[in-house]
Amino acid sequence: MPQLGCLARFFNRYKDEFKFAKKNNFDFMQLWYDNRGLCLHEDDKDFINTINKYNFPTIIHAVLNINEFEEHIPKLLDILNKLNHKELIIHPICENEDIDEETLNKLNLNIKYALNILKPHGINLFLENNSKLDPIFTTTDEIQKIFSQNADLEFLLDIAHIDNTNHLQELIDIKYPKILHIADRHFDVIHEHLPIGHGEIDFQYIFSKLLPKYNGKIILEIVNKDSDIINSKNLIENFLNTPNQ
């Protein structure tokens, strides 16, 4: 059975997010990181001590612009070691320049830089595919190029960032994802993360035909009210437990 995770929502106190995750049988929580550092409720500083105090599994999701890797990968390594993490998710963005072949080459070099720092510490790096809102590491060709040049890089597949079912199949064929981001969306909206069942994604088809017997990690990227998260978890568990047709 896959491990199911939820978000540690930074607008809530960490102790409340911990209680919610534990009460609803989540296996871990995802922590947000960007160029400000770890993002948790301001009343929970020092964040490292707060996270370690509750002794609940977590994983960091780092949103990094392509010009921020050299500054933040060493900072992330320090945090990962303090939290005893062996996995890191990077969500690449590009806010400061046009996205073209040269930009993709910069991303490739930054990934190699990150791998060279993280791998000696036994830390696996996962790169997340993007939506068309910030179209870098989005298309099949871009994703194929990055993975073909970085054998040690792992794939986090964000299902809410796909264009359609064919796009999803192509991405799975390039690199089997060991982690999934799960949320629903309407395909005519450029970027959405809705509760499961509130959009157009056919998760039953995905887990019966495209990712049958999936056994990796699944993170519900849903920040709505608690009931939406719980209902989404129940639906995904039902899809995972439905016999393949």
Model-derived features: positions:
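N-terminal pre-domain/capping segments
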Residues: 1-81, 245
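Histidine-acidic metal/acid-base catalytic patches
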Residues: 1-3, 14-22, 77-86, 137-140, ...
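Alpha-helix N-cap/loop-to-helix initiation residues
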Residues: 14, 37-40, 66-69, 96, ...
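Hydrophobic "anchor" residues on beta-strands that sit immediately upstream
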Residues: 26, 30, 57, 124, ...
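Well-ordered, non-membrane alpha-helical segments in soluble/globular domains
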Residues: 43-47, 72-74, 104-112, 199, ...
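Alpha-helix-loop-beta-strand connector modules within alpha/beta enzyme cores
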Residues: 47-61, 110-118, 146-150, 203-208
